[in-house]
A protein has these predicted regions:
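Short amphipathic alpha-helix that is part of the acyltransferase structural core
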Residues: 1-37, 54, 62-84
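Conserved acyl-donor/pantetheine-binding loop and adjacent beta-alpha core of acyl/acetyltransferases
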Residues: 74-122
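Conserved GNAT acetyl-CoA-binding A-motif
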Residues: 116-123, 151-164
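Conserved acetyl-CoA-binding loop-helix of GNAT-fold acetyltransferases
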Residues: 127, 136-149, 176-177
């Protein structure tokens, strides 16, 4: 039986498991290429930030899936730079040496705070991941249901997320099935086509 809960301060030791799970679920993603130490630092920041967090799905105390989210994404990015820039730089040094093009892309990612600003208060579902061996068991839906349950839609206009538009049919269908609506599609500076989805709660 899966237990869905918010990761608390006493369980930060599980950040390493979350980083490994990200690596196995998204082996070809840019952040994965930056290495496990980088991922550990990133997900630690979600537990450290008062307006962010990680929801986990556990079975026998083993993490099988998670969501990382932020109630103030622009502020979250600013805090990454102010508090952990040197740590991120150190963690990604090896990847930058192997792939110099990563440097420009990483700088662009850290300068994202102005891009994620929106008129309304919203919650960013920044990452959702399920152990590939556990797919098809409803873990992703239960994680999203927990995200919906802890969101006060009288304060936040919607839950926002982004995902690849191409060769990603299963994920796009999954979000639509779970009540998300396509808000826009766009192309990143690297030429990656993305879909942005929003969930407005029961008010729409």
């Amino acid at each position: 039986m899966y237990q869905i809960r918010i990761l608390d301060e006493s369980n930060k030791v599980k950040i390493s498991t979350i980083a490994e799970l990200h690596k196995h679920a998204f082996p070809d993603f840019f952040l994965t290429q930056l290495g496990i130490p980088f991922l550990r630092t990133l997900y630690f920041c979600y537990t450290e930030d008062s307006e962010s967090g990680i929801i986990v799905a556990e079975d026998s105390d083993q993490i099988k899936g998670f969501i990382a989210y932020s109630k103030d994404y622009p502020r979250f990015y600013n805090q990454l730079i102010k508090k952990h820039l040197l740590r991120f730089a150190f963690c990604s040094l090896g990847a930058a040496i192997r792939h110099p093009s990563f440097i420009k892309r990483l700088l662009r990612a850290f300068n994202k705070s102005h891009e994620v600003k929106k008129e309304e208060a919203y919650i960013e579902l920044a990452s959702i991941c399920v152990d590939p061996k556990e797919e098809g068991k409803g873990i992703g839906t239960r994680l999203i249901d927990k995200m919906k349950a802890i969101t006060d839609f009288s304060v936040y206009a919607y839950i926002n997320l982004e995902t690849d538009a191409c060769e990603n049919d299963a994920a796009n269908k999954f979000y639509i099935k779970n009540g998300f609506r396509l808000n826009r599609s766009y192309v990143t500076a690297e030429g990656r086509r993305m879909n942005e989805y929003r969930y407005y709660g029961e008010k729409r």
